Amino acid sequence: MNIFKIRSAALWIGRALSVSAIIALPSMASDMPTSQYHIDSDEIKMVDMPSVLLPFNNLMFLYGVDASQFDLADFIYVNAPDLIDKEEAITHWAGYYSINPKVILTLMEMQSQLISSPTEKALNRPLGALSDKQGFEEQLQDVLAQLSQRFYAYEESQLKGLYPPRTDAVNASSFALLALLNGRRIEQHAVMSGEHALGLDPFIEQFRLLFGNTDRELLMSSVAQNPPVADSTQSMQQVVPLANITASSLPPSNMLQMPWRQGYSWQSNGAHSHTGSGYPLSSIDVSYDWPQWGSPTYSVASAHGGTVNVLSHCQVRVTNANGWATNYYHMDQITVRNGQYVNQNTVMGIYANNKNAALCEGGSSTGPHLHFSLLKDGRHVSLQDVHLGQYRVNIGSYNYDNNCSRFNLFDVSNNRTMCAWAPLYNAGSL
């Protein structure tokens, strides 16, 4: 299996048992945050164009129902046998960034004709000029990262009111695709100087040809754009008050437990985005005792009931029928299978104690832990006010914020506030 590298670094972490007992923090394990992406005003000008009549459906762009039901192995076997040994890389990174594999396959066909006319050159640079990287896995991960960064940056900009759209035909997925496809033009200011920007029509047509989806599935009216959910990070606080977070934007308070077996206590670090930078703060890292590589590690359990997608040898997603899902990364010895229904507290494997197992498709981590994320309909969602069992999350002001006055987990059963690195007993869902 091909493995590529992402930058790594240690984060300062440690133990703090409660508001009343905070001690000095040693260094522990986590993942390296990616650099935060900021929208350029030229990108906003580029997408406000009349050629985009209806926005691309966010639900088709994200790794939601359509993606989870897509038989990638069968599609590759029938249509692109040269990609058989790339299947896990595609599912892993598409799942990690939560973008429909159909999106990346469509872009590959547009850029290199890898599916219809495969060549060695196309296999090495399947996404062509969309990425400066060399190699299949490198370009795959890079372009998915670009799409994810643009998607969530656009949602954040809309929540903050920075760039009010001049057309209803642009949503987060349309912006992400348009900004990616026009990246070179934006860098050269060609779009602003009169050169026509690339619209979404070629992408949508190629998507139709490959997968047979209809316009009704691919496009959406402006009244049903699946709007983003408010976050409470520092960058959002002045724009969307926490009072605006409604019950409909949160999973049921009795739905989730912590992602380890009931009856045990683990520890969590501060909330962060799925990539460690930007918005929303949908994830936490958890471990029994934050050991070194090679030390014993323990069972990961489903936080709720739902259907399993095994995304790779080290990553699993569980999706409930109500659209809420949880993602589990850096796993090993996975015991569940694709399509299996699991109940809450079902053991699905362990978090890996071997670096190569934890990073089965590349990446970096400085020690064993589970990277746990919350999603709704494929979109990463803030953990703010989410109940993980008896603990209600307050995400803090920024990624990996460990200050207990900002990031904490309120124990509603015992009326106390728990800080990062405090032992959290898993009694199941409320």
Model segments located where?
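Generic structural motif
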Residues: 258, 264-268, 298-310, 342-345
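Acidic, glycine-rich catalytic/binding loops that coordinate metals and/or anionic ligands
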Residues: 249, 254-256, 294, 343, ...
